[in-house]
């Protein structure tokens, strides 16, 4: 037996979340099903979990398989036959037996995409349509998140985290064509953290919440915003080991 690392992307609008679901509608279920067509039945482990409607341009999973799979490019090609159209295998690598796909992660990155173009039902599942805003001000507000923080007021209930302390390496905004993008990089994220963060920044930009209140929520003093930004604009974009 050997252990392989699978790097892949997926369309979150086709699933009820990345983790296995009771009705087999999770990304994990679909990828496990594709592997089973190739005779790989070992448990599939995922590096990150995403909610219903959240996408990934770069996700990672690991699984044990027979060491007779010597041609990993061929395995990738065959696996894509059973994974398309909503999952795409980008690369398969052999890893050491002690590789821990979730706990060996050094950092994760997410991007939240806003479209300022005219509404399109064909794009509605993949961006958050929103009026243009002050990108410089958004960058200033996002900067409040950078550093080691207790983000207990930026997480949904139901997570399995032992602590709400996280270190945010990057929180910034930038423009690309008709899009504005929020980029987050951290040593880990709490359940719903980014969507709560995005919604809180938008509330300040809309004048519905003050900078002082945002800072107090980040400093774990008081929660002013309980609402989450829609999931469709969020993408898991990088996992580093």
Swiss-Prot record:
InterPro entries: PsdUridine_synth_cat_dom_sf, PsdUridine_synth_TruA, PsdUridine_synth_TruA_a/b_dom, PsdUridine_synth_TruA_C, TruA/RsuA/RluB/E/F_N. Keywords: Isomerase, tRNA processing. The active site is at residue 51. GO terms for molecular function: RNA binding; tRNA pseudouridine(38-40) synthase activity. Its EC number is 5.4.99.12. It catalyses: uridine(38/39/40) in tRNA = pseudouridine(38/39/40) in tRNA. Substrate binds at residue 110. It comes from the Bacteria. GO terms for biological process: tRNA pseudouridine synthesis. Transmembrane segments: none annotated. It is an enzyme of class 5 (isomerase). Belongs to the tRNA pseudouridine synthase TruA family. Formation of pseudouridine at positions 38, 39 and 40 in the anticodon stem and loop of transfer RNAs. Homodimer. PANTHER family: PSEUDOURIDYLATE SYNTHASE, TRNA PSEUDOURIDINE SYNTHASE-LIKE 1. This is tRNA pseudouridine synthase A.
